From Swiss-Prot:
InterPro entries: Gln_synt_N, Gln_synt_N_sf, Gln_synth/guanido_kin_cat_dom, Gln_synth_cat_dom, Gln_synth_gly_rich_site, Gln_synth_N_conserv_site, Glutamine_Synthetase. Gene3D superfamilies: Glutamine synthetase, N-terminal domain, Glutamine synthetase/guanido kinase, catalytic domain. Pfam families: Gln-synt_C, Gln-synt_N. Keywords: ATP-binding, Cytoplasm, Ligase, Nucleotide-binding. It comes from Nicotiana plumbaginifolia (Leadwort-leaved tobacco). One of its GO terms (molecular function) is ATP binding. Residues 19-99 form the GS beta-grasp domain. This is Glutamine synthetase. It is found in: Cytoplasm. The lineage of its organism: Eukaryota, Viridiplantae, Streptophyta, Embryophyta, Tracheophyta. Coiled coil: none annotated.
Length: 356
């Protein structure tokens, strides 16, 4: 085993200029992540200088067998925390050979919104709170829970410490450091209300980079959990009953909101979001109706309401923002399995462009 570990951690820069690039893309479910690696002649820092690649879309549910080739376009580069050295992770989006985005490629449409001159001028910032649940492999039951049984009621687990309250901290600390190494703008982590559930926060990130960073963060988390023999669930309500669900609260601000007088801009943006509540809910993740019940720190899925410091609202404004008269707000509706490209672009579209 020591030899295997030595080989896994081999520093290639001592013997070759070649590097390994791990190309990452979103699979056919719209939530599964796929990746494969290739050798490059030397270090690369600009995704535009990376070669396009292809994969068998018939094996990912993204193309028919008789015309199975799907093309990967490199879009963002991160340092590889697993191979280290000059090796890289590459976030890609996927296209047909004719250059058309495939249905699961939500990045393409998001990039158009974020390149709109009105959106560019407003420099939208995002902070995404990604919740997830760690499951025991093979039994689909939260980490730390007794097999076939339940732990004590919620209360002591949120930001808790101790072997009877925090389950999977080794995984959490590992991915936290791996994100920092990779260049992901992670701002923190914490244990969540339901035992076995955790959260990491990405941001503030500008525009399309928020989606790139969340997807690569999910990929790194999945890889670390794979090593640990644990399953990551992004289900918005993994356990029925009196247990908190899992969301992806999305904090948002524009340049106008961050400047003096920004509070009025925030109120107008919230009003726009309320007018398009149904459209946003439809795009905010599968199974969200099981989570947005009006209980467990959520608003009911059928109702839009906002409030200051209200975690039972659809949109929450912080006390600091109210006091300062400028800042940001939090859209609490997105589910943990949301596509960050869709959510971030839709919020910008509704609040800045205002045509969708």
């Amino acid at each position: 085993m020591s030899l295997l570990s030595d080989l896994i951690n081999l520093n290639l820069s001592d013997s070759t200029e070649k590097i390994i690039a791990e190309y990452i893309w979103i699979g056919g479910s719209g939530m599964d992540l796929r990746s494969k690696a290739r050798t490059l002649s030397g270090p690369v820092t600009d995704p535009a200088k990376l070669p396009k690649w292809n994969y068998d879309g018939s094996s990912t549910g993204q193309a028919p067998g008789e015309d199975s080739e799907v093309i990967l376009y490199p879009q963002a580069i991160f340092k590889d925390p697993f191979r280290r050295g000059n090796n890289i992770l590459v976030m890609c989006d996927a296209y047909t050979p004719a250059g058309e985005p495939i249905p699961t490629n939500k990045r393409h449409a998001a990039a158009k919104i974020f390149s709109n001159p009105d959106v560019v001028a407003e420099e939208p910032w995002y902070g995404i709170e990604q919740e997830y649940t760690l499951l025991q492999r093979d039994i689909n039951w939260p980490l730390g829970w007794p097999i076939g049984g339940f732990p004590g009621p919620q209360g002591p687990y949120y930001c808790g410490t101790g072997a009877d309250k925090a389950f999977g901290r080794d995984i959490v600390d590992s991915h936290y450091k791996a994100y920092l190494y990779a260049g992901i703008n992670i701002s923190g982590i914490n244990g969540e209300v339901m035992p076995g559930q955790w959260e990491f926060q990405v941001g503030p990130s500008v525009g399309i980079s928020a989606g790139d960073e969340v997807w690569v963060a999910r990929y790194i988390l999945e890889r670390i959990a794979e090593i640990a023999g644990v399953v990551v669930s992004f289900d918005p309500k993994p356990i029925p009953g009196d247990w908190n669900g899992a969301g992806a609260h999305t904090n948002y601000s524009t340049k106008s909101m961050r400047e003096d007088g920004g509070y009025e801009v925030i109120l107008k943006a919230i009003e726009k979001l309320g007018l398009k509540h149904k459209e946003h809910i439809a795009a905010y993740g599968e199974g969200n109706e099981r989570r947005l019940t009006g209980k467990h720190e959520t608003a009911n899925i059928s109702t839009f309401k906002w409030g200051v410091a209200n975690r039972g609202a659809s949109v929450r404004v912080g006390r600091d923002t109210e006091k300062a008269g400028k800042g940001y707000f939090e859209d609490r509706r997105p589910a943990s399995n949301m596509d960050p490209y869709v959510v971030t672009a839709m919020i910008a579209d509704t609040t800045i462009i205002g045509k969708s």
